[in-house]
Amino acid sequence: MAAAFSHVIFDLDGTILNTLEDLAAAGNHTCEAHGWPTFAVDEYRYKVGNGMLKLVERFMPAEYAGDGRMFEQALAEFRAYYGEHKEDHTAPYAGTIEMLDRLRAAGVQLAVLTNKDHVSAAPLIEKYFGSERFALVQGRVDAFPPKPEAPVTLHVMEELGADPSTTLYVGDSNVDILTGHNAGLKSAGVSWGFRGRAELESAGADYVVDTQGELAALILGE
């Protein structure tokens, strides 16, 4: 039986890789350097998801809102620290590699679309998943507005030769559900990520799954 979806586009952070501790460490390192308040790791679950620029904006104190010079300094510091420490605690979620291999064996084409800077996303995919599992990896670049805006998703689909009716976007946040819908795709939410089932259902996810096995069965039409 043919798979229900021929192409699947995955979010990165909170979906296939647990990057939260390293993102939090980079954020708190930047905060500490300026004497700003720091945050518990779990608080970063709601700061990430819209790219590094938004993340920095969210951990900076409100008194610096609109201070472009301070923002650029904090962004540069965050990027430098994260670039050196992005693999300290990061790891694929259990069962993810097996799921990806099961999908590839069934002929499903896989891609990654993330708001993480491309210069960080591409090496992480290479390290943890190799070069053969994903046909395309697209991180944040200046040529496109970030997710959930449609242009970058449409670009990925064009590169893949994907049909919207048989393409699924998979992620862990409301941003990801909107990313799929804004490009005319079905969206699946994974409850093991940074945000959880309630946010995914509230955002209008077409599907919400709790395990990698459930996700594979959904994609394969089993």
Language model features by range: what are they?
Residues 11, 19, 48, 112-113, ...:
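Small/polar loops that bind or transfer phosphate-bearing groups
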